[in-house]
Amino acid sequence: MYHNIKIENISPSVAKELLSTVPDYQRKIKAGYVLKLAAEMAKGAWRLSPDALVKMNGALVNGQHRLSALVRVGRQFPFIVLTTKDEGIYGITDQGVKRTIADIIHVPHGGIISSAAKLVVEYKKGLITPHGRTWNSVNICTNSDIVDYANKNMEELSESAALTSRLYGKTPVLSKRMAAALIEIGRNKNKQKAVLFVTRLYEGGGENDAAYDMRERLIKNSASNSKLNQSYMFGLLIKSMKSYFNGTRTGVLKITDGEKFPTFD
């Protein structure tokens, strides 16, 4: 795979040329951040950064804020420039403005896909607790983990994201990312049941199963001034979906103190 890295003095005219190659799927420029960088450059506080400008297959995929600031100031500055044909480099770049995973997965419903993939990866790694997330130096969820998972499961995630977007538009009782993540978690056992469970959460129907009980809890929570935290709610959803698959009801929907986060084994 071709790579070339060197230090270049970038002039305003070269910066404009590079900015003209930015792909359509790239993030929009954040004017406030550009002004901040421009102010640093104008007062001479700008130094050579280890965060390289990245040109991938002729397009600028990293550095548009810095180059926009350079153009605004109208002066030349040195940059490390990486030229590559490796599209995988886009998934691990780490710029001054935090890149969201949705920027990496530039597809329809990318925001839902990326956030659902993150939730599934965290769930599979055992990083979710009823009270939030848990982290350690060994078991963590990285951007690369999320991108890899999303790319391997893109077709299924895209279908789920499109479905949950339509359902959410009718009755927004459950976040689209949680709904898509539920389908993703349940589909290996029974995709049809997973889709039906999530659909029932939004649209209702029936009064004698776990989907009905969970929908009532979601409606009650959405109307409450004291809402359950998202991790706790996701745990209830997992527990409820497991009961739905088994043809049982969960009874009182809660996670007791000391209880481990629900699984879908």
Enumerate the predicted regions with their spans.
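Short alpha-helix boundary/capping and kink motifs at helix termini
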Residues: 1-84
